Amino acid sequence: MVLYTPGKTSGYPSEKIDSGIRFYFLGGAEEVGNVGCIIEDNTGTRLLIDYGMAPTRPPKYPSESPRVSDAIITHSHIDHIGMVPWLAGAYGTTLHGSSLTAKVSEIMWRDTYKVSSIENYPLSWDK
């Protein structure tokens, strides 16, 4: 299991962007699941698109996200939302998505928590 320490264990590049935008994948770029992508511009503004975990036994977690103020959640599959509770708890990130995505995500997080208890594996956002 990966235990994150907000701002301490991220592999996100520290160098500034001179121009254009940076796309940085925290997971999911070369695999199914474990999704997370940060888009950052040259002003340092960052936007995270999805932040999930692979639904394996035990789960596979993406790289730690750096601090982001906003995240877009595209849909409620666990490989796109599984790490969002950690993100919101660690950074107070504002989540953006449809009202249906919000409702289904809450159900999915409760189910993920229940399954983790039954199968005896901790979640990185489990406190």
Tell what function each PLM region has.
Residues 29-34, 38-73, 77-78, 82-93, ...:
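Pre-active-site segment of Zn-dependent metallo-hydrolases
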